[in-house]
């Protein structure tokens, strides 16, 4: 039996989760929410995380019914992510590991999403679409690496959606992406937007620039509604994602798709991906917002896999990095 506690705080979510041999014992989380029209700055986000992290830690232990002595390993997000929030979490994780006398493990945030998705859905060897505010990648496992077959060449799809939400002042509570999804359901007019796919790579900066420039003019002249813009943006960027995922599946000979990351809990994206999978005779796997959105349990799960395969992060090496690619990690726990 191996019990791992995971600390996640790479962006505006702070979460601490506990995993015991594939069972989620606890997974509390807090979100730093800013006013409509604003994003979240690293310093202010880190300040929020510092104010709640010890409370979340106590909640995680209480919900799991565990004490420090029961924990076998402390895992934390090493990167990628925003510098100040990552530092906040790493400092607490290092301190806890030393106070409790437990080994420490730095975890790649992207690997955390993948391993949590595999655990929850029981997907065996899927092509992974990883979509969030900071990342957009199409990934498949090969020879001890999660290989990146396609990715954004500029901004992430979640960042595109978030920045559009700021333009038309959509609420950040509970998240801009969720509110765009709800508004898109009421849209009934499709506005043609730039569509940029290059092989298995995508670009979202052009579509964002176009819609940022055109939104107020179109809305002020009654050419469309905010709901129409949300609908059109979603349909366009999700079609791009489905296209590159299908291309990667064909390249890899895969019959499974796993969607992970915060944008992955969007039901319209899952629906569109499901149509493509059905036409190919493939299967789609996805999780709900409990595990798609950044959380501590995903770091604990990746840490559990790493710890059991012999990984440990020594204290002098327990730094953080804002840039940490998925394919940099040797995946020693898979055949």
Curated annotation (Swiss-Prot):
Domain of life the protein comes from: Eukaryota
Enzyme class: transferase
Cofactor note: Binds 1 divalent metal cation per subunit.
Keyword Metal-binding: yes
GO biological process: one example: tRNA threonylcarbamoyladenosine modification
Pfam family, any one: TsaD
Gene3D superfamilies: 3.30.420.40
Reaction it catalyzes: L-threonylcarbamoyladenylate + adenosine(37) in tRNA = N(6)-L-threonylcarbamoyladenosine(37) in tRNA + AMP + H(+)
Cofactor field: a divalent metal cation
Keywords per UniProt: Acyltransferase, Cytoplasm, Metal-binding, Nucleus, Transferase, tRNA processing
The enzyme's E.C. designation: 2.3.1.234
Oligomer status and interactors: Component of the EKC/KEOPS complex composed of at least tp53rk, tprkb, osgep and lage3; the whole complex dimerizes.
Protein purpose: Component of the EKC/KEOPS complex that is required for the formation of a threonylcarbamoyl group on adenosine at position 37 (t(6)A37) in tRNAs that read codons beginning with adenine. The complex is probably involved in the transfer of the threonylcarbamoyl moiety of threonylcarbamoyl-AMP (TC-AMP) to the N6 group of A37. OSGEP likely plays a direct catalytic role in this reaction, but requires other protein(s) of the complex to fulfill this activity.
NCBIfam families: arch_KAE1, gcp_kae1
Protein name: tRNA N6-adenosine threonylcarbamoyltransferase
Organism whose genome encodes this protein: Danio rerio (Zebrafish)
Lineage start: Eukaryota, Metazoa, Chordata, Craniata, Vertebrata
